[in-house]
Amino acid sequence: HHPQVNFNIFHEKSIPVAEGVSAGTYDIGFCSMVEHMDDLFFVPITYQELIVIVRNDHPLAQYDSIELPALKDYALCTYRDTIPIGKTVRAILKEKGLEAAHSYDDEISIAGRINRSSKAAIVADTPFLKQFDNLKKIHLTDVPKDTRMIYMVYSKKNFITAAVEAFANFMVAHCLDLPPEF
């Protein structure tokens, strides 16, 4: 029982979250895996499937699922490759000989762009996409569902209070949503 616990919630991208946890600004963070942060411990919590989004009037909108090579004749956009998910998407596309414009920070920016264009985008299936009712979500059958993992991250070097430890244990006990093969 922890009667004096306050939660302060901050929304930030993965790298600043990891840096904040490392610096002791945050006790715990939720983010993608961030490389070269050896003082941090990343615990897999959930995943977000990488999907294709297009406008409902796009030729690909007739499909519920496709493989990546089906995108070869279409202009693609995705996250910029200076953020973890952008690096991941670029590697997946390169493996299949595909290219995309890597210029966006988040799902809202990408969906907003697709909303007004004839392009297709590769994006994580997040709740942010729900606000765009004229976009079709298409599953990628040749991309593992757990390609974009979300981790709970904490620092090995910073003091963790009993309340923070209890919260971390609660997350692991009650909130894990990992793909079956994980």
Protein language model features and the residues they cover:
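Beta-alpha-beta core module
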Residues: M37-E49, Y63, S109-F159, A166
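Generic preference for hydrophobic
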Residues: I9, F30, F42, V52-I53, ...
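Secondary-structure junction motif
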Residues: Y74-K96, D125, I160-A168, L178, ...
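Flexible hinge/capping segments at coil-to-helix
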Residues: F42-L50, V54-L76
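Central regulatory/effector-binding core of bacterial HTH transcription factors
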Residues: H1-M37
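Conserved functional loop/turn residues at catalytic and ligand-binding sites
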Residues: N6, G20, G24-T25, P44, ...
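Hydrophobic hinge/microswitch elements
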Residues: K13-A18, S22-Y26, T82-H139
